[in-house]
Amino acid sequence: MIHGTTVWPSPAKLNLFLYITGRRANGYHDLQTLFQFLDHGDELTITANNSGNITLSPALADVALEDNLIYKAAMALKNAAQSPLGADIQLHKVLPMGGGIGGGSSNAATTLVALNYLWQTGLSDDQLAEIGLALGADVPVFTRGFAAFAEGVGEELSAVEPEEKWYLVVRPAVSIATKDIFTHPQLMRNTPKRDLASLLTTPYENDCEKIVRSLYPEVDKQLSWLLQYAPSRLTGTGSCVFAEFSSRKDAQAVFAQLSDNVLAFVAQGRNVSPLRKTLADYQSAKIRPY
């Protein structure tokens, strides 16, 4: 066990494009999507211990501990590795729930990667991804930590290196349940499947965007506003929308024009997750527990 207190990033992600190519008999959807991380997100402070218990603070409103993805991830790793150890986990929450930028999935992945290191359980990236997939379809991309083209239900990952652009991400004042969008009868589910080279050289789109804009006027309003300034899209099933820029200066200039009551941030895309960089820094003793 690694002693001391450690701090771990739990970064946001964007779906730079998202296409739904079919629906399976079990209700799951076949996708083609491009994930990229952001240098912005939540933060987990974790101290491993010998108690055998997992404590988490602060509690999330309306979410029981047993239903919290951080707790579920810790217990899943504990069971898979048959570890007798415990941990105290503190979450500094920045990312919105129901925003489509991976907040809960990223938290779960950070928990898996951090505790695998702190408990010295020695599970491989493949094993962590397998545990993560049982927690949520997006968790494996966060545990593996590289920008990825995903197919299947999102579990078939291929490393890619899209341009690391600057993004203005806006959070409309609504929370959207992924299930509500994927079960909507008007959702387009038959986009023709294409090879990656074709997808990367044509304008990026999101098949969920049309239905989300029709159901949530606030999303439509914010996206229409962003489109005045730059190419802009929905990420995941929303509610967050984003505009892409070639420089931080350009993104900040548009950010400065937003109303004070609009939640938004500027961040740069990252093809290697900040989580993987932090893990490497701990492993090399570039940074140490305190």
Curated annotation (Swiss-Prot):
Pathway: Isoprenoid biosynthesis; isopentenyl diphosphate biosynthesis via DXP pathway; isopentenyl diphosphate from 1-deoxy-D-xylulose 5-phosphate: step 3/6. ATP binds at residues 96-106. It comes from the Bacteria. GO terms for biological process: isopentenyl diphosphate biosynthetic process, methylerythritol 4-phosphate pathway; terpenoid biosynthetic process. Keywords: ATP-binding, Isoprene biosynthesis, Kinase, Nucleotide-binding, Transferase. Disulfide bonds: none annotated. It is an enzyme of class 2 (transferase). Pfam families: GHMP_kinases_C, GHMP_kinases_N. It catalyses: 4-CDP-2-C-methyl-D-erythritol + ATP = 4-CDP-2-C-methyl-D-erythritol 2-phosphate + ADP + H(+). The active site is at 13, 138. Its EC number is 2.7.1.148. InterPro entries: GHMP_kinase_C_dom, GHMP_kinase_C_sf, GHMP_kinase_N_dom, IspE, Ribosomal_Su5_D2-typ_SF, Ribsml_uS5_D2-typ_fold_subgr. HAMAP family: IspE (MF_00061). Belongs to the GHMP kinase family. IspE subfamily. This is 4-diphosphocytidyl-2-C-methyl-D-erythritol kinase. It comes from Vibrio cholerae serotype O1 (strain ATCC 39541 / Classical Ogawa 395 / O395).
